[in-house]
Design a protein with these regions (language model features):
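Hydrophobic, well-ordered secondary-structure segments
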Residues: 44, 56, 60-64, 76
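Short membrane-interfacial helix/loop motifs at transmembrane-helix boundaries
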Residues: 1-17
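Phosphate-coordinating loops and pocket residues in cytosolic domains that bind phosphorylated ligands
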Residues: 10-11, 61, 94, 169, ...
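Short, hydrophobic secondary-structure boundary micro-motifs
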Residues: 5-9, 75-76, 91-95, 157, ...
Length: 257
């Protein structure tokens, strides 16, 4: 018994060390993209529900369905063609997470030089990760808020003379967020799988490619480590969701009576 995940069958490196190198990249991309998607899609979903079937709602719906229908590999390739192409706009690097010729240190969350150097490499991947999450989350938020705004207690709140802002944000938003919180429980496990396609296109050394290689190479230690970490993160995600349920919905309480 070693007390760890052993060594990879592919390169004979420690599985734990390999995961420590790759996991932060996938986790960072997933977390940042989810935060951005929530910050954009939740307000838009609320306002679309309030303006149901009007010009704003119809316009947002068309845009969201267009974004949701675009394959991630197409968006990633288009972003590289437009913004990492000397013939168009060479604004961002096209591949990898750093330039070994000018910066050869490891990624660090606390080193500002590391963050400044590597930040441009993450802009396009974050956009590619965010757009599909934004489209799906926006639709869920809109449908949830439409159901909530048609409830009896919302009509009662309006009959009391409360402002629309107070009715929506104070009475409607809490219940409208419940499906979004349920979705949030899957964020952490998603950081393990990452996105094989997007990480490959942008040259991100994350977990997606590692999982794919481990399966093809029948790398048992790596596969066991991935499933173990996925299980731990799944439990963590559900725990955080349960806590958020109790915060958002006053009907839920975990205290003993």
């Amino acid at each position: 018994i070693r007390g760890d995940f052993g060594k990879s069958y592919i390169d004979n490196k420690s599985v734990g060390d390999k995961m420590l190198e790759m996991f932060p990249y996938s986790f960072f991309l997933v977390i940042i993209s989810i935060i951005l998607a929530y910050l954009i899609s939740i307000p838009l979903g609320i306002y679309s529900a309030y303006k149901k079937n009007r010009l704003f709602d119809n316009g947002v719906s068309v845009l969201v369905f267009m974004l949701y229908s675009l394959p991630s590999f197409f968006v990633a390739t288009w972003l590289l063609y437009q913004f990492s192409n000397p013939d168009n706009l060479l604004w961002f690097p096209s591949n990898g997470v750093k330039n070994p010729a000018t910066y050869n240190n490891d990624w660090s969350w606390y080193d500002m030089d590391s963050i400044k150097h590597q930040a441009p490499y993450f802009v396009l991947p974050i956009i590619a990760f965010t757009y599909s999450s934004f489209a799906f989350t926006n639709r869920i938020m809109r449908v949830s808020m439409i159901d909530v705004l048609g409830a009896d207690y919302i009509r009662t709140a309006r009959a009391k003379g409360l402002s629309e802002r107070h009715v929506i944000l104070k009475h409607g938003l809490r219940n409208g967020l419940l499906p979004i919180i349920t979705m949030f429980s899957n964020v952490f496990p998603a950081a393990i799988g990452g996105s094989v396609i997007l990480e490959t296109i942008f040259g991100i050394p994350g977990m997606g490619g590692a999982v794919y290689e481990a399966i093809l190479g029948i790398d048992i230690p790596m596969i066991v480590a991935v499933f173990t970490l996925t299980g731990a993160l799944t439990v963590t995600g559900y725990l955080i969701s349960d806590v958020l349920y109790a915060i958002v919905d006053p009907r839920i309480s975990y205290s003993k009576k």
